[in-house]
Regions:
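Asp-box/WD-like beta-propeller blade repeats and closely related beta-sheet repeat scaffolds
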Residues: 79-173, 187-195
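Blade-terminus and WD-like Trp-Asp/Gly-His loop motifs, strongest in beta-propeller folds
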Residues: 35-44, 49, 88-101, 142, ...
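Blade-level signature of beta-propeller repeat domains, shared across WD40, Kelch, NHL, RCC1
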Residues: 378-410
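Blade-loop segments of beta-propeller domains
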Residues: 27, 31-34, 52-102
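Conserved blade-ending motifs and adjacent loop-strand segments that build the rim/top face
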Residues: 254-263, 312-326, 358-386
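Short, conserved, GDST-rich strand-edge loop motifs in beta-rich repeat architectures
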Residues: 49-61, 100-110, 159-171, 215-237, ...
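A short helix->beta-strand "capping" segment at the edge of beta-propeller domains
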Residues: 9-29, 362-365
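Loop/turn-rich, solvent-exposed surfaces of beta-rich toroidal or solenoidal domains
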Residues: 265, 270-290, 296-301, 311-360
Length: 410
C-alpha cells in the first residue's frame, strides 16, 4: 500500500488520505461496486489482479482474486489459483468466500462450479456443479456474469448467464439460484431481455425481503448465436425490477423509459433497507441524477410512468448532478459516487442519505479527482466499506489500472 498525497487537491477536505492498494505492472481492479466482497467488520475485502472493472478473461492464468487486509497495511494474499475463477461473494458472516469456476462454452456448455473457501485459504470445497442443461432452460449455461450475489442469511447464491444453444440468435439468458445447504440449483428467470441482469440480493433481515433480488431488464438488445452482443439495449431502454428468488412476485421500480429519462444500468439497495437507488440520464435538462424509490406491483414496463410510483431525487440539491457509479454503506446512511467531467479525470463525492424518504442529500462533499481516463476498462466504480469510514475506487492515472482507497472523513 502506497500513500498518494499527490492525488489530493486544494479542493479536497482537510484530513483526506489516499492510498494506492495495488502496484503491479499488470492491471488490477476492485470488484464491481455492487458486489458483496467485504467482511462485515470492514477489515478485509476482495479485489483482483490481471483484471478490469467489469471482470476478467476466463482463460487468463494470471488472473487471481486477492484478500486485502486493511489491518495489515493492505497486505494482499491470493485466495484463488484456478483458471476461470469469477463472480466472488463474501458470506454475510465474513468467514468464507463463494466463487465460481467458469469452464463453459456458448452452445456447448461445460462446467460451472460453485466453490467455497475460508478467507485464510483453508477448507476449499465444491458446493455444486452445473454440467448439463438445467431443467426448463433452452440450452446449456455459459457466459456467467462476472458478479454473483449472496442472500442475507448466506443460504443462497445467484448468478446469471447465457442459455443459448449455439445456433439461435437472440437466445434466452437466465438467472440461477444455488441453494447452498442442499447443493441444488434452480433457473428462476429466463428470456432474451435478461442479458445484463446485475442481480443483487436485498440485505434486509426481514424474512420475506431477504429473498428479493433487484434485476435489470435490457429491452431491445441483440446478440448473436454465441451470446456476443451486437446491441446491448434499444428502444426506451432498460427498466429495473425486483423478483423473489423462487421466480415469483415480479415487481417494478418507477425509473426511466419515458423518452426523456433512462436508467444508466447502475442500481443498488440502499444499505440493508428495502429502498432502492439508481442513476438516471436525462436528455432535457442534460443531467445524470440519483433517484430512489420502492417497489410497485408489476403492471408492465412503464418505468417512471408506473402508476403509484413515488420517487425521491437524492441529488436535487447538488449544483451540477452528473453522477454515474455509486454505492452506500451497510446502514444505508452514507453514499459515495463518481461524477463528471469525464474528460477531466472525473470526481468523487460523498454525501449522507436522509432517513426521510422525501429529502435530498444536502451535505455533498467533494473528495478528489481520481485521474481516470474513463474508458470502459478503467471505470472508477467507487464503493464504501460497510462502516462507511473508507472509500475505494479504480484509476489508471499512473498509466496502468490500479486499485485505490480514500478516507479521513470519519
Amino acid at each position: 500500500m502506497r500513500e498518494r498525497p499527490d492525488l489530493i487537491s486544494d479542493q479536497s477536505p482537510g484530513g483526506i488520505e489516499v492510498h494506492q492498494l495495488t502496484t503491479e505492472s499488470i492491471p488490477s481492479s476492485h470488484i464491481y461496486m455492487e458486489a458483496q466482497i467485504f467482511t462485515p467488520d470492514s477489515r478485509r475485502l476482495i479485489l483482483h489482479r490481471s483484471a478490469h472493472p467489469h471482470g476478467s478473461n476466463p482463460e487468463d492464468p494470471a488472473h487471481q482474486y486477492l484478500v486485502c487486509d486493511l489491518d495489515k497495511a493492505g497486505q494482499m494474499s491470493p485466495i484463488t489459483t484456478e483458471l476461470g475463477a469469477t463472480a466472488p461473494s463474501i458470506a454475510p458472516q465474513g468467514d468464507v468466500l463463494y466463487y465460481f469456476i467458469n469452464a463453459t462454452e456458448p452452445g456447448v456448455g461445460g462446467r460451472l462450479t460453485l466453490k467455497r473457501v475460508r478467507l485464510d485459504g483453508t477448507s476449499r470445497e465444491e458446493i455444486c456443479v452445473v454440467d448439463e442443461i438445467i431443467p426448463g432452460a433452452s440450452g446449456p449455461f455459459s457466459r456467467p456474469y462476472p458478479l454473483s450475489t449472496i442472500s442475507a442469511d448466506g443460504q443462497r447464491v445467484a448468478i446469471s448467464g447465457f442459455l443459448g444453444d449455439g445456433s439461435t440468435a437472440n437466445a434466452p439468458w437466465g438467472l440461477l439460484v444455488f441453494d447452498v445447504p442442499s447443493a441444488t440449483v434452480e433457473l428462476v428467470l429466463q428470456g432474451a431481455s435478461w442479458c445484463n441482469v446485475h442481480p443483487q440480493y436485498c440485505r434486509s433481515q426481514d424474512p420475506s425481503a431477504s429473498h428479493d433480488l433487484i434485476v435489470q431488464e435490457n429491452h431491445g438488445n441483440d446478440c448473436d448465436a454465441t451470446g456476443a452482443f451486437t446491441k446491448l439495449i434499444g428502444g426506451a431502454g432498460a427498466d429495473i425490477h425486483v423478483i423473489a428468488d423462487d421466480g415469483t412476485n415480479l415487481r417494478d421500480l418507477p425509473w426511466g423509459r419515458d423518452g426523456n429519462e433512462s436508467c444508466q444500468g447502475h442500481q443498488c439497495w440502499i444499505g440493508d433497507t428495502q429502498r432502492a437507488l439508481t442513476s438516471t440520464s436525462k436528455r432535457e435538462p442534460k443531467v445524470a441524477e440519483l433517484i430512489e424509490a420502492r417497489t410497485l406491483p408489476h403492471i408492465g414496463h412503464e418505468g417512471l410512468k408506473t402508476p403509484g410510483g413515488v420517487r425521491n431525487n437524492l441529488s436535487r440539491e447538488h449544483p451540477a448532478p452528473d453522477f454515474h457509479h455509486f454505492a452506500t454503506d451497510a446502514a444505508g446512511r452514507r453514499l459515495i459516487t463518481d461524477a463528471g467531467p469525464r474528460d477531466g479525470g472525473g470526481a468523487l463525492w460523498l454525501g449522507t442519505i436522509p432517513t426521510d424518504e422525501t429529502k435530498a442529500i444536502e451535505d455533498w462533499t467533494y473528495l478528489m479527482c481520481p485521474g481516470s481516463s474513463w474508458q470502459k476498462n478503467t471505470h472508477i466504480h467507487p464503493f464504501l466499506s460497510p462502516d462507511g469510514r473508507v472509500g475505494f475506487f479504480n484509476s489508471d492515472e499512473s498509466g496502468v489500472l490500479q486499485s485505490y482507497m480514500v478516507g479521513g472523513w470519519a
